[in-house]
Amino acid sequence: MIIGLSDAFALGGIALSFLVAYQFIYFYFIYSPRAKKLGCAPPVIVFSFPLGLPALYKFATAMLHDNLLEYISIRIADMKVRTGFQTLAGQRWLVTLEPENIKTVLATSFKDYSLGFRYDIMYGLLGNGIFTLSGDGWKHSRALLRPQFSREQVSHLESMRTHINLMINNHFKGGQVVDAQALYHNLTIDTATEFLFGESTNTLDPDLAQQGLPGPKGLVTGEQFAEAFTSALEILSVRVIVGAAWFLIWTPKFWRSCKVCHNFIDYFVYKALATPMEKDQEADRYVFIRELTKETSDPRVIRDQALNILLAGRDTTAGLLSFITYYLGAYPEVYAELREAVLSEFGSTDVETPTFEQLKQCKVLQNVIREVLRLHPNVPLNFRQAIVDTKLPTGGGPNGDQPVFVPKGQNVFYSTYSMQRRTDIWGPDATTFRPDRWNEPREALASGWDYIPFNGGPRICLGQQFALTEASYTIVRICQEFSRIEVLHPDVITSKNSMKQRMRLTQTASGGVITRFIR
């Protein structure tokens, strides 16, 4: 039977009417009574076009134009409250910016939540690792990895020093215009692979980057691995955005990229398993993957964990360094103050490598890093899925001060980016880069739940000290070598504090950070 266009529209209208009716019935006759029984009150409910399709279109458009984080902040602000329901692509999300609610999800009621569909989204590349697993699998991964990120291990700066100096001498010192963000991605993958595998991808050295390694499935170069890793992460980020419909995002290029990454990592895995480290080598040099072989001989476990750590070790630190450079160029007075402090505390040359403790004690440096992480947290958007009926402490009722019922299966979304820019917490200049705010009494809140650039609770980032150490040392070396940073990014000219940001799994500066380092 063939139906006419008018009949098709009529059927579509009927289907949409049923969807609207279902939303109404669910919230007022199913959700609300269950919430009341638990002493909870419903939060604000933002009803949108059925399935939230217009919102999805705006969401996708904002992402394509590198304006997603600002769009989400505006959309949340339009709710007029800080906890409420919104619908996107047929998925009902409980959105919150309340520190107490986020604390409950990540810490107080940690056992009530899982990563939801994140495991399925990322499994193709990352496998069973610390960033994909929940429950007992996650506990085992964390127990396996925690010793590898002890203070003693992350405070070894000599291997970082080699790659940082290579970047400065080969790419920064000539006074040429460079994309600092691209070079920071090279730096962090080189230092991360050195830490993980004992051998670097050497992407900052074109000659070494072209040398192939004999993986189980053929030769692969460090440059090929870096490109494949970036390509695979691009696809994963789109999958995260579309959520439960992630399975629609499938491309042959993704699987080819995964195979290149796995082949590259497997070279180091099988090498580590075949050649145990000698006692004198153990004392001389720390290598993550070799230490892991002392805990397990399963090559798949080692590969998955190494890839998970590599994800965190590269993109988050590169993003942090990129935004630091942007702001230091946009605010020359801040750079002048920072450089004066660095030269006073560390000297003007790289004769001696600073210690982990010295870097942490440089207050001006740490204030700059804290402020950048406030404005640009490593993972600005995140979510958890309830695995049991549970509740949040605040956000319900007409005044938003009553508990909120979270039914099993409900996704709870939180934006660290938006929360860390709230004017009621950080003042009227919350969106402005001002490092000296960390000299004020409210600095104590840095240990609270309104400032969680590395997440919080049991799943707090294991590698945060590694990232902070690398970022700190890199900025110290830049200050020692250059009197001024000239950022040619167009946003510096129009508005220093409203730069476009490209949101994928982590955030980066849209268009790179086009820079000239001046001696």
Curated annotation (Swiss-Prot):
**Superkingdom field:** Eukaryota
Recorded hits in InterPro entries, A to Z, give: Cyt_P450, Cyt_P450_CS, Cyt_P450_E_CYP52_ascomycetes, Cyt_P450_E_CYP52_fungi, Cyt_P450_E_grp-II, Cyt_P450_sf
Q: Which of this chain's residues are annotated to bind heme?
A: 479
Residue spans crossing the bilayer: 10-30, 44-64
Identify the SUPFAM superfamilies for this entry: Cytochrome P450 (SSF48264)
Alphabetized, the UniProt keywords read: Heme, Iron, Membrane, Metal-binding, Monooxygenase, Oxidoreductase, Transmembrane, Transmembrane helix
Q: E.C. number, please? A: 1.14.14.-
| Record carries keyword Iron | yes
Instruction: Give the record's membrane topology.
Output: Multi-pass membrane protein
Question: What are the subcellular locations of this protein?
Answer: Membrane
A single MF term (Gene Ontology): oxidoreductase activity, acting on paired donors, with incorporation or reduction of molecular oxygen, reduced flavin or flavoprotein as one donor, and incorporation of one atom of oxygen
Q: Which Gene3D superfamilies match?
A: Cytochrome P450
- Family named by the database record: Belongs to the cytochrome P450 family.
This chain belongs to which protein, by name? Cytochrome P450 52E1
Species of origin? Candida apicola
The UniProt gene name for this protein comes to CYP52E1
